């Protein structure tokens, strides 16, 4: 049997973050938690999700299972989520039973789980290759507030289609060029809430629209870790905090984006 309970707002925001990158996902569930990997249709970006069992309000998985889910369909279900809603997921071990049971309860309006909204969803067979993410040691890393990252990527996207990201000792520089305009922004270690480490100067160019899509995860995490090295995809990682404490959790949502070589 598989069952879990998770904060409704978090669960809804997670699928809202993914909706323009993936159409279908396989949530791989085992005793340690839920994992998911997926590529966008252009095969230039990769999503890596890991939610460990301790992050959930309740988690149980007696037998490994895969939940094939349509993102848009799940968002329709989660549209009733309110600020203090809780989501329950339940699935029997029977392999022939391709149904996910979902319960949604609003803690402010309902007194018990017996009053929850009950939904049954037929799982899909999301055809996904299992992807191996190579372990890379990045030369440069920058930690900053995720909201600041989101605000500036949106601004860059309004100016140009591509953004150059450069890192050197104590600084990260983002720049883009539009019609008769060039915008450059430098983030340095002496700025509030910025931490940069760099062992080798690196500069690469990326499609701005992907950074905007990734930045939607700012609703899930206060900080973002940007990692850069030559000739490999940039890593943009959002770590989740445990819901009842301020401690960082191994749970995360990480995006990888290939540098611009041609058009994509």
From Swiss-Prot:
GO molecular function terms noted in the UniProt entry: DNA binding; DNA polymerase processivity factor activity
Cellular location(s): Nucleus; Chromosome; Cytoplasm
GO cellular component annotations of the record: chromosome; cytoplasm; nucleus; PCNA complex
Disulfide feature: none
InterPro entries: DNA_clamp_sf (IPR046938), Pr_cel_nuc_antig (IPR000730), Pr_cel_nuc_antig_C (IPR022649), Pr_cel_nuc_antig_CS (IPR022659), Pr_cel_nuc_antig_N (IPR022648)
One GO BP annotation of this record: translesion synthesis
Keywords: Chromosome, Cytoplasm, DNA-binding, Nucleus
Induction or repression: Induced by DNA damage (at protein level).
Record flagged with keyword DNA-binding: yes
Principal cellular location given in the protein's record: nucleus
One family name in Pfam for this protein: PCNA_C
Role according to the record: May be involved in DNA damage response. Appears not to be involved in DNA replication in trophozoites.
Family: Belongs to the PCNA family.
Assembly description: Homotrimer. Oligomer. Interacts with ORC1 (via PIP-box motif). Interacts with FEN1.
Name of the protein described by the UniProt record: Proliferating cell nuclear antigen 2
Originating species: Plasmodium falciparum (isolate 3D7)
Organism phylogeny: Eukaryota, Sar, Alveolata, Apicomplexa, Aconoidasida
């Amino acid at each position: 049997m598989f069952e879990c309970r998770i904060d409704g707002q978090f669960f809804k925001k997670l699928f809202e973050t993914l909706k323009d990158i993936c159409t279908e996902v396989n949530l791989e569930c085992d005793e340690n938690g839920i994992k998911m990997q997926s590529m966008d249709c252009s095969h230039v970006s990769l999503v890596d999700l890991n939610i460990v069992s301790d992050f959930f309000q309740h988690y149980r998985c007696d037998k490994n299972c895969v939940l094939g889910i349509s993102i848009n369909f799940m968002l329709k279900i989660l549209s009733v989520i309110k600020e203090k809603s809780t989501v329950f997921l339940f699935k029997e071990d029977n392999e022939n039973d391709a149904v996910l049971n979902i319960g949604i309860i609003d803690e402010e309006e309902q007194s018990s789980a017996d009053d929850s909204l009950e939904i049954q969803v037929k799982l899909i067979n999301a055809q996904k290759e299992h992807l191996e993410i190579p372990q890379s040691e990045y030369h440069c890393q920058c930690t900053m507030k995720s909201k600041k990252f989101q605000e500036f990527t949106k601004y860059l996207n309004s100016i140009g289609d591509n953004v150059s990201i450069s890192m050197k000792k104590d600084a990260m520089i983002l720049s883009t060029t539009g019609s008769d305009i060039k915008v450059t922004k430098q983030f340095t270690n002496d700025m509030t809430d910025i931490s940069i480490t760099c062992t080798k100067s690196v500069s690469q160019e990326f499609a701005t629209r992907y950074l905007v899509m990734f930045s939607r995860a700012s609703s899930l995490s206060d900080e973002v870790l940007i990692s850069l090295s030559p000739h490999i995809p940039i890593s943009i990682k959002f770590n989740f905090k445990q819901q009842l404490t301020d401690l960082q959790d191994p749970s995360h949502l990480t995006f990888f984006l290939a540098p611009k070589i041609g058009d994509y």
